[in-house]
A protein has these predicted regions:
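Single conserved hydrophobic/aromatic residue that forms the stacking wall/gate
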Residues: 2-11
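Interdomain "pre-motor" coupling segment immediately N-terminal to P-loop NTPase/helicase cores
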Residues: 10-67
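N-terminal pre-P-loop "Q-motif" helix
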Residues: 62, 77-106
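Hydrophobic anchor at the beta1->P-loop junction of P-loop NTPases
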Residues: 110
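Conserved lysine of the Walker
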Residues: 118
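Conserved helicase/translocase motor-coupling segment
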Residues: 122, 226-231, 245-266, 273-390
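Conserved P-loop NTPase catalytic core
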Residues: 158-305, 310
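C-terminal accessory regions
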Residues: 216, 361-365, 369-462
């Protein structure tokens, strides 16, 4: 086996020793070792036939991986699709098969708001395409969904068996054109222009489209929450056109989070001044939304809900430092509001969303975006206030450990108008995302008393 990647720590795991003995494995940086292996086992020439087979061989998912994933989704309620989601799912399968048949590059853009089932469709598509002998991966910038899905899908299997199905978008600048049959990109609004802290590559979107015969982008424009977030429908279209790829677009309308209330989603967008929407009556929905005056009361309510299902969490805007010294200490208090004290999520163990004790820690946008709970308690920090009859965003109230606003200070010096627009988008989208993580309810507490009053009035007026 030859792997042109730098995942040697995974593929060379001691768990795979027996397999590697039968099928020698070479990873990036081991060219001299591969050269010696070829010299040893190919004693005479064959008119370059072996080299041709290596160069033109098609990468396929292994039989053991296909056997492993065949039962992963069976009976798993969290990945069960509804009829409206199945329409997009079936179209993905059809387009992927068509690409295999005519070898034409295609890009699908699927737009959908919170709770429309983007991730459910994405995971189902990856599993089913692999079962059809196609080679591809589930891609997302945010590590939280990847880690949670690996845990939930693995079940009793070793996680290493399915870990290779999930990847970040940072390595594709190293790939050759059409190395993959398909790539399913979830949370595509979080893609960056360049990769990693060293800004490698040219354009992540261009690199993903180039690397795959068929690329699917799932996007929610209201969930761009980082200064460097680059993914947009217009950029997907532009990069697809530059590579002569056919573009197919879908929009997912019905949402199944927030007790299926499209009205609640619309109200949140309207209340956060993201867009003007028609008001609705809170009495008409069963979603449990409340404004709580004391963060200690909010914590007690969420703990009570968590006792029922294990799926309730407290989330907050990133306005408190995540101190390095306390990241593994559950008794370290990062967030202090009067006599209310809690720590941010711990930097160890299981992913925050499914860790057994994480109800006693506070999650942020980076540990919860792309995931859902039954109930969420959201603490809105001083980065969002209500002054002079309007919402005011203030990136200076964000913690220094929050990288999502890095770059704004410089941009404010160069282009204040653009900086203000991006700042507002980041902060409002962050709270929109946090407030739409709950399936059954959302309780909020605002550090700014005027914002607390504004939201209460918005409920009364609805």
């Amino acid at each position: 086996e030859i792997y042109s990647c730098d995942w040697s720590s995974d593929v060379c795991s001691s768990d795979l020793n027996a397999c590697i003995e039968k099928s020698p494995l070479f990873t990036q940086g081991e060219i001299p070792r591969l050269r010696e292996f070829i010299k040893k086992h190919l004693k005479q020439g064959d008119h370059k036939e072996v080299l041709y087979l290596i160069e033109n061989g098609r990468i396929r998912p292994s039989k053991s991986l296909q056997d492993c994933i065949s039962s992963m989704l069976d009976g798993n309620q969290e990945f069960t699709m509804l009829d409206t989601q199945k329409v997009v799912f079936e179209e993905i399968l059809y387009m992927a098969r068509l690409c295999q048949k005519d070898k034409r590059k295609r890009v699908m853009i699927a737009k959908g708001g919170s709770g429309t089932g983007k991730s459910v469709i994405a995971v189902n598509a990856v599993v089913n395409l692999l079962k059809e002998d196609m080679f591809g991966q589930y891609i997302t910038k945010n590590a939280a969904p990847r880690n949670v899905y690996i845990n939930r899908l693995a079940g009793k299997m070793k996680k290493n068996k399915i870990k290779s199905l999930f990847a970040a978008p940072d390595k594709f600048y190293q790939q050759q054109p059409n190395d993959y049959d398909f790539l399913i990109v979830d949370e595509a609004h979080r893609l960056r222009e360049k990769s990693g802290m060293f800004q490698k590559g040219e354009n992540q979107i261009q690199e993903l489209i180039s690397s795959s015969l068929f690329t699917v982008f799932f996007i929610d424009p209201y969930q761009r929450v980082h200064f460097r977030d680059f993914g947009s429908i217009s950029e997907f279209q532009k990069q697809a056109q530059l590579q002569n790829a056919e573009v197919i677009q879908y929009e997912l309308h019905s949402q199944f989070r927030c007790n299926g209330s499209d009205g609640y989603i619309a109200w949140i967008r309207n209340m956060l001044q993201l867009e003007e929407t028609a008001n609705f009556n809170f009495k008409d929905i069963s979603f449990d939304f409340r404004v709580i005056d004391d963060p200690n009361e909010l914590r007690a309510m969420i703990c009570e809900k968590n006792d029922e299902s294990g799926k309730a969490r407290i989330l907050a805007g990133y306005c408190w430092e995540w101190e390095k010294a306390g990241r593994s200490d559950p008794n370290h208090d990062d967030i202090v509001i009067g006599d209310f004290k809690m720590s941010w999520n711990l930097d160890a163990g299981d992913p925050y969303a499914i860790s057994q004790g994480s109800v006693h820690q506070v999650g942020c946008i980076h540990t919860t975006q792309g995931l859902e709970f039954d109930y969420v308690g959201v603490i809105i920090g001083e980065d969002l206030r209500y002054e002079n009859n309007e919402l005011v965003t203030d990136y200076r109230q964000r913690a220094k450990t929050d990288s999502s606003v890095k770059g704004l200070k410089k941009l404010y010096r160069e282009n204040p108008e653009k900086a203000k627009h991006i700042e507002r988008q980041i902060i409002l989208n962050t709270y929109y995302t946090l407030m739409t993580r709950g399936m059954k309810g959302c309780y909020i507490y605002c550090c700014d008393s005027e914002l607390q009053k504004y939201i209460k009035m918005s409920i009364a007026d609805a």
